[in-house]
Amino acid sequence: MEVICKHYTPLDIASQAIRTCWQSFEYSDDGGCKDRDLIHRVGNIFRHSSTLEHLYYNFEIKGLSRGALQELSRHRIASLSVKSSRYTLRELKEVESFLPLNETNLERAKEFLVFVDDEKVNEMSVLALENLRVLLSEHNIKNDLAKYAMPESYKTHLAYSINARSLQNLLTLRSSNKALKEMQDLAKALFDALPYEHQYLFEDCLKH
């Protein structure tokens, strides 16, 4: 999985929004320590979390499984643009069979699938991938129908935009050891992709 922060709102946008409430612009230090502390104090300590919604982050996420994508989409205050399965399935039409299930073919399948820490689950995912390949290349099934046979482990690619308040909620829930392991990895990757000067707003959200 690869996560890149493509764009983000400067911190001073949030601090200026907060200062609008009290008309305290003269105390601003133009995004310096005073303003950073103000955002944390008002948004995190005093729990006026709506002020954090002025901060927005735009991520590119590569290699997330379709199963994890479903869980990510449950975080409603966010925008997703996902690689179409029509174009995804074009990639599979011309590849060779993934059988037999040997080391070479399992390694080839990793281009398309997210593997987990269970050999049998991974083998079943590759068999599902092979069935999908057969539908496309040997039976000429249209992509719109063939996608119903896509395994949940199939990798996807998306643009993901979310505000700081919603991102805090996501990191809090998905960094827990009760969350799906792939979602734990995603939460860590999203945090790591944030600009360093923004990470202090989210450090308390991480469960481990």
Swiss-Prot record:
Cytoplasm as UniProt keyword: no
Domain ThyX positions: 1-208
Entry annotated with the keyword Flavoprotein: yes
Position of sequence motif ThyX motif: 74-84
Annotated coiled-coil segments of the chain: none
Enzyme active site: 174
Binding-site residues, dUMP: 71-74, 84-86, 147, 174
Keywords, comma-separated and alphabetical: FAD, Flavoprotein, Methyltransferase, NADP, Nucleotide biosynthesis, Transferase
Cystine bridges: none
GO terms, biological process: dTMP biosynthetic process; dTTP biosynthetic process; methylation
Binding site for FAD: 50, 74-76, 163-165, 169
Pfam (any one): Thy1
Cofactor note: Binds 4 FAD per tetramer. Each FAD binding site is formed by three monomers.
EC number(s) reported in the record: 2.1.1.148
InterPro entries, sorted: Thymidylate_synthase_ThyX, Thymidylate_synthase_ThyX_sf
This protein's pathway: Pyrimidine metabolism; dTTP biosynthesis
A GO molecular-function descriptor: flavin adenine dinucleotide binding
Swiss-Prot/TrEMBL catalytic activity: dUMP + (6R)-5,10-methylene-5,6,7,8-tetrahydrofolate + NADPH + H(+) = dTMP + (6S)-5,6,7,8-tetrahydrofolate + NADP(+)
NCBIfam families: thyX
Family in the record: Belongs to the thymidylate synthase ThyX family.
Subunit structure comment from the entry: Homotetramer.
Stated name of the protein: Flavin-dependent thymidylate synthase
Gene: thyX
